[in-house]
Amino acid sequence: MKYDFSTLSPDDFENLSRDLVGAETGVRFEAFTVGADDGMDGRHAKADGSIILQAKHYLRSGFSKLKSKMREERVSIDELAPQRYILTTSVPLTPANKATLTEIIGPSLVGPGDIFGADDLNGLLRSYPEIVKAHEGLWAHSTPVLEEVVTNAVRKAMAPAEVPKTLARLMPPPGAADAPIEPVKRDTIFIIKASPIDDEFTLWLAPKLEAEGYQVFADVLTLMPGERWRREITSALRHRAVKVLLLCRDSSLEDSSIQDDLDIALETGKELGDQRFVIPLRMETFRKIKGLGDTVAVDFVRNWGEGLLKLIDTLQRQKVQRSIDTMINPNWEIYRRRGAVPIIEVPERLTSNWLRVAEAPDFIRYFECSGSINKGRLQGAIDSYGHPCALVGGSGFLAFGGVPEIEMAFEAVGRFKLKHEIPLVEFTEGGFQRLRIDRQIASNLVVAMLKKAWFNYCKRNGFIEHGYSNGIGFHASPEQAPTGKRIPWGNQAEKKRSSMLRNSAKGHIWQFGVTAMPAFWPFWHFKLKSRVLFAQDNDTPAGLVVDDPKKLHRLRRSVCKGWRNKQWYGRLLAFLELLSGESAFVRLPLSETETFVIEASPMLFSSPVSTVLPNDLDDEDEELDDSTLGRPDSDEEGGE
């Protein structure tokens, strides 16, 4: 198509000239704002001189006006003294016209070839079609060009999307529909799942199977799970699946797309003669699945790790081939990160549940009986002693007490002598070979003694002991923390705050408590684990204790669901306030003369980065909701 440039303003023509001549000569021209230009519409500076470009949009004035204007410009051109001068014009030029202009412009013009008339510019537009698209003033009023632009846009929008490479390599090769398909190696485990409920588990399971040498496919690998590539995924399953893992829960098995995929998998298994082609994975309890018969599902309800081991064992027993060359597909991680919280380079202060150890005894002592001794009587004497001890060997024990204290406490059992005084840190880090105690046993013995000291301290201060499956916790008694009472915590500098350790909700009384676990790495500290107990509200301060573990679990999931992190942290600080009283430390007696001192305030850590999530929950440090549950709409939640 030939353009006459009549639709362009003078500024538009200058811009077009810079782009065309710049593309043709391979140089970039500077652009200048509207106004006096000293004979320049574009300039390219070089060490040995400048290249000057001037554009003259004289279409309607014709060659005569252009010639007169160039005579006026001659003085400016000579003053600029460019190494090279280039002229563009919208006026059509003959060879004679160019010769006339060459004489007028003078020595700055290298030759007639540096004069671009309308025909020359049209030639450049044909050579650089992308410049045509960039200058819509050329074609905005041209029906043929507009039709071409719209047609190309529609064709591009309607073009079928390219199948993701991860999926494309599993599909049958293209060919005639009735052409026989060459048999290929079945080497891919397909996962049938519901989105998005099963995405997290799939992103956890698939890389671990690939690490074992299995090739795995699920729709999240396309980075667009769901219906987008359904037909292609079905084709790939028929073509390459060696096994199919079905994630089972009633809610997902009712999905029509899951049922369709399962039907295809069962049909494929029948064609292959593999009755165990589909391996169900139990994510929740589910009803019997038609077509799977009595197939036993691999259980992932209790523990994902145990389920993975059973699944790998199942695949090995069914002789599913593995490859040492299998690489973990990076798309698993790419999809997992799509919902990740962005990190920013701003430090953030973090709270913790660690209490730093401030003081500890220098030595632990080993006492041994000088004669024969009854172990039962020795254990009874240790229990009566009231401070931590640990039996070692047949006739001795470890303790922190001094010689006079031990002799007096154990005189009814036998005569004990101090055999070894061992540096405490050396003992926990290296054991004590003279007593045949290795490092791990030594560490365990000291941990047990420190736990005993914590238990004794909590009991003496009126806290209620409760045994959990993985430890002993202590809760404030109804006298220490009555139902609905706020326990103040914090110092005056950060304003005094308060939290509840006991309150009523959903017809039950909940009570907050703590389990303490001593640890030596990376430094000595106590780690606190929050606990919540429930009692049926029978109008008594303590209530009727709920002992059923399943009911306790349901109550924790429902009642504590509305508690935010700051509420949990506030309860922990309120508990420590009761535990330490007016002191900044908790002093655990290890003997009549030795104490183990831990700080009563949890440690603060600093992270070099933080997230962009908002943190506007400061008002919840002071519990405005009387139920402290963050669920004020519940009819059964009591207040003060």
From Swiss-Prot:
Top-rank lineage group of the source organism: Bacteria
Q: Which InterPro entries match?
A: TIR_dom (IPR000157), Toll_tir_struct_dom_sf (IPR035897)
Record key words, sorted: Plasmid
Q: Which residues form the TIR domain?
A: 184-328
Region Disordered: list its residue ranges. 613-640
The Gene Ontology biological process terms listed for this entry are: signal transduction
Question: In what ranges is there compositional bias, type Acidic residues?
Answer: 616-626
Q: What is this protein called?
A: Uncharacterized protein y4cD
Lineage of origin: Bacteria, Pseudomonadati, Pseudomonadota, Alphaproteobacteria, Hyphomicrobiales
